Amino acid sequence: FFALIAALGIYRELKPVNKIKVKTGENNKISWYSKSIYPFLIFAAILSLCQASLIQSIGFYITDLFGNLENLPTLISMTFALLSISTIVSQYLFTDAFPMKNFSLLMVGSILLAFSYFTMAFFQSISFYYLSIMILGIGFGMTRPALSSSLSLAQTPENQGSAAGYLGSVIPIGHMTTPFIAMPIYAINPGYLYYFSSILCLSLIHISEPTRLSV
């Protein structure tokens, strides 16, 4: 009901825009392997795998490493709360209050992700774990909006919808591949999974260079 009211309000506030017809040929069509598309899809797929492996392993990790602590369900739920809060705060700070360029958001966010995954695996204490989770939230809050914005800006107006569709289709890859990639690594050693994610995030720094992403 409230969603319907919000949709009606947004519709009433939309201003009419004169459409400009542009002749487009076959060369203007994009595909997932277009130069302006595939680097973003690779970035999104890696980011999705890192985030999905984290989400699916939080409960296991806390239980395996901090099983001697009391109120494990509370500790696990606090992890999700800290991750969500830090992500929301990061998105507000770096996209609204103190906006940064997309390239800077992608670069700094990737560095924070790599650093936090490493500290999470190396310092196996609950305090460092929570601190790493908050830094992870900041990193996710910087990279995710910058990625979608950069992809949109790299396309012509008539191709922005298709590009957004490609990006949306890649995001679930992390949850699909985590049981086959992340969990076997976790079974060997819980810390190895986060070292692996840290290495993947270092590759994001390489992918986010301006020569690869048009940001």
Enumerate the predicted regions with their spans:
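Structural signature of the two symmetry-related core transmembrane helices
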Residues: 104-118
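A late C-terminal transmembrane helix in Major Facilitator Superfamily
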Residues: 159-187
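Intracellular juxtamembrane helix-capping segments at the cytosolic ends
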Residues: 142-155
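Short amphipathic helix-loop junctions that connect adjacent transmembrane helices
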Residues: 56-74
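Helix-to-loop junctions at the C-terminal end of transmembrane segments
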Residues: 89-102
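Juxtamembrane intracellular "pre-TM" segments in multi-pass secondary transporters
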Residues: 14-41
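Residue-level detector of conserved catalytic or cofactor/ligand-binding positions
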Residues: 203-215
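C-terminal membrane-cytosol helix-exit motif in multi-pass small-molecule transporters
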Residues: 2-20, 208
